[in-house]
Amino acid sequence: MDFPNLVLSAKNSIQNVDSKDEKQKIIDQLISDIRGQNDGVIPDEVLSEIQQVAEINGLSFNYEKPVKQELLEQPDPTSVLSQEVFQIRTILSKTLFVDVEAEDYSVYIPDETSNLSPVQIDARPIQTYQPKALMYKDTAILPSNRDEVSDQYGADEILFDSHMFNDISQAQIRDFETYVLDKAMQIQSSLPNLDFVSSLDKEVNPFNVHNTLCLNFGQREYYNIIADRTNQSFQQRRQSVQFDNVVVDGVARRARVSLRLHPFDSQLLDIIRFNTIQDQPLADTMAEYQLVAADGFVATPRFRTDRDARLIADVRSRVMARLCELSPYFHRTRILSSMTDFNSLWKVNVFSSSIDNAKDAIYRMAEISFTVADATTSALSSVNIASAQQTLLVLLNMSLFRFEIEPVGSQSNFGAAVSAALMLVVFPTDEASMSNVTFDNLCNLVFNELIAWTVDRPTFVKRTGMTNAFEANVNIGGGNMTRDITAYMRFVLLRRPWAVFQRTYDDQYVADIMVPNIDEANVNDQSYMAINNLFSGLIQAAQRNPNPGRQIAATSFRKLLKSMKDSCCNRIMPLIRLMKYNVERIARIYRFFPYTADLVQRIPAFRDERIRIKVPVSGMLSIALGINKSPDVFDWYNLLRFADVIRTKNFAERQSLESIMVQALIRNDINPARSRKEYIQQNIKPATNVVASITKVPSATFTTILSDRMLNNEIRRTQSYIVVNRIRDAVRAAFEHVPTAEHGIAKGALLLPYPQNFQRSSVYVRKDNILYNAPVGVDRFSLDDLLNGRFYQGMVNRIQNMSPFVIAGPLQVRASNASAIDSVTSAYLTMSSPYDACVKPEDLRHNRIVQPPIVDFFSDSSITRPNTQFEQLMSKTSVFVIDAPKLIVQSDATVYNFDYRDIQLTTSVVDKLEFTSVKTPDVTLFNGMLVFED
């Protein structure tokens, strides 16, 4: 099939006709011919050429590649796999865990879903840049002023075209700034984002075989045009091309390339350095990873890294940080997402499959027979593995995050009371970490279930001003209230906070890492002593009291206490070591953490906005009874992969959130009546659940958030905002300096009270009504002012006084050809009428211009028309269109300097490292202490 020849002949036919309809017919015929000969499919090698022809001439061309749909076989309708099943999704809620003691569970079926669209990091080096101004050949016309002598064609010249502005419509003229913004966003989406060249399309210079030509950046078209040596017009250009060359410096990794570019393209190439993907050296991060993994692993690079190997930067969006401060819901969603990420990292497999053996041993020691159905057998009923694991995860997460805990589960039995007594020692009880209500409830539970009955005191009931049982009873001595019990109560009432393990380096992004302020080696640490004191005091009091247990027989109660003392006092230290083991290792990747900030220090009101997590009351006792082995050793490969994932996630979240915020902000700056909120909600493409959650913020709240001055300032500091604004400036400047009348848009118009003869704006036309500069001394009116009713009376006054004036601003033009003027049609009538019939009655009623006026544009470039006196008489116009001159492609090339190297950008570091395990047989802390000793 000879498709290229078909396209070539269609190109020539399109150039030979003037009207847009004829051109469209030719291209439609071409497409139908090709599809008819090729089973309805357009081959790829021809498709790009047709698209280019259509784009240059402003023609419409839509083609979708056919997709083959094949169904191999029908699924089995009886199969379990093909039946409809519920998909249970994780929900964003303030409650993180399911209550393990509840008898019935809830399954959440989502009533709405949010579609996530991952951010594609598309690496585009400089040579992928597609020039916006293409080149074409035009021929000068030498007009004749005698009827018997026809016009002649003169020398050829190569010009830049302006097809990049062939998509402005009447609606976009009214809102020209938005059109410029859309154009800038469109350019930014395809603008190179790597500030170097990775390859060049080169060819031997035919005019100087010692040099090389670069065919990228649309230069191939230029060299094709001047290659015709029979065309003497380009002799000078061919001599200049002898000096075109590509010089590559392999040591400095630079390339010097000779190019001829439109100033607009040159400006966009300068903007590329602001649009680059933010990156950092790969070698530095690899060295950091190797140091982190040095605990039990040896990480060696798989291959040597080049000096230009880069890694996407670990960027933390300032816009997201400010949004978290403004919206507690967004902050909680982000914290919850981070917490979910962390849960899989902790090493908590320290329990055997069941605690029943430990419970049986305790029951046997207490001589409790299972045939007796009394409250004794339910004393430890709520102790189980699920509670232990859940509580352990909460404890570990508390070291990285700050949240509120809510004790749940049965709070009226012996096991819950013992567990609460341990919680008061291990958990942080200071006001900043635990609310007063939770603290009081735990203290009251311990007092009422364990202490009051044993020491023969009345149970405590909350009253106004006296809510804590320990405060009420700590100073009342005598009776069976021994010093040991009082010592425990005093210790708890100190409300000791956890110790700081590592201070935050940025309190807007991460919180301090905290650990229990309990020694992991010294058995005489006051926390262990406090628990010991409590049990010693209780055992002593129970021996003197004939009925010490509230619901349990006296002998069983005393024996239960003794066995509890052994279990609890001995198992708290392994728990503290286990926490230290986890925290000190995860803290090594502190620099790569996800968002864990606690904003209470910055905004005190956020104290009530923390996530609330349910903790089983019996959890601490479950841990104490269940912990019976060492955890797994840390796998640094997974931990460092986690760091890679978080880096990529931060990058994607920043990209997807900031780009939409910038567009919404600029649209609102252009027209403050436009809603930023609606634009964001309709157009956001969330990369993660966190970004998607912004659309769930209530409407009025979201409006308030978006009006925050600090948030808007952060948006204005983003890379995306800077790039879009620079491209907008370049597009505006390009519009002012390229000819656009041929695409139906002019820069302005000079309106006259009486017709004048046509003039000739350039050597490429016989005559037209284009002016490059408005005459000096003529009043100018801005279209924007007139649309808003400013200075409209002044314009009417000029018309009444028969004075010429200029309307400056993008105006739509109505193209008229020469035959329409000849035949005295409406085009002739409007062009020769005063002011081009500019003033409409509707405008006078509104006292402003309601619709931007459409002015007539006439251009005659046909040399076949004779220069008759009749034509001279008719060719007058009262409107002159203001446009820019055509830009000639420079003869001598400009030398551009680019970095020249391979694309070595990566998102993952662990793939470049090889991990060799050299772990010791025992799991130890960094100070060499065993985590679990039998």
Swiss-Prot record:
Gene Ontology CC terms, in alphabetical order: T=2 icosahedral viral capsid; viral inner capsid; viral nucleocapsid
Q: Where in the cell is it found?
A: Virion
Sorted keywords for this record are: Capsid protein, Inner capsid protein, RNA-binding, T=2 icosahedral capsid protein, Virion
**Superkingdom of the organism of origin:** Viruses
User: Would the keyword Transcription regulation turn up in this protein's UniProt record?
Assistant: no
Subcellular location, principal: virion
Q: Which GO terms describe its molecular function?
A: RNA binding
Known function: Inner capsid protein that self-assembles to form an icosahedral capsid with a T=2 symmetry, which consists of 120 copies of VP2, with channels at each of its five-fold vertices. This capsid constitutes the innermost concentric layer of the viral mature particle. It encapsidates the polymerase VP1, the capping enzyme VP3 and the genomic dsRNA, thereby defining the core.
Its quaternary organisation is: Homodecamer; each decamer is made up of two conformers of VP2, called VP2A and VP2B. Interacts with a VP1-VP3 complex. Interacts with the intermediate capsid protein VP6. Interacts with NSP5. Interacts (via N-terminus) with NSP2.
The entry sums up its family as follows: Belongs to the rotavirus VP2 family.
User: Mind telling me what this protein is named?
Assistant: Inner capsid protein VP2
| Native organism | Rotavirus B (isolate RVB/Rat/United States/IDIR/1984/G1P[X])
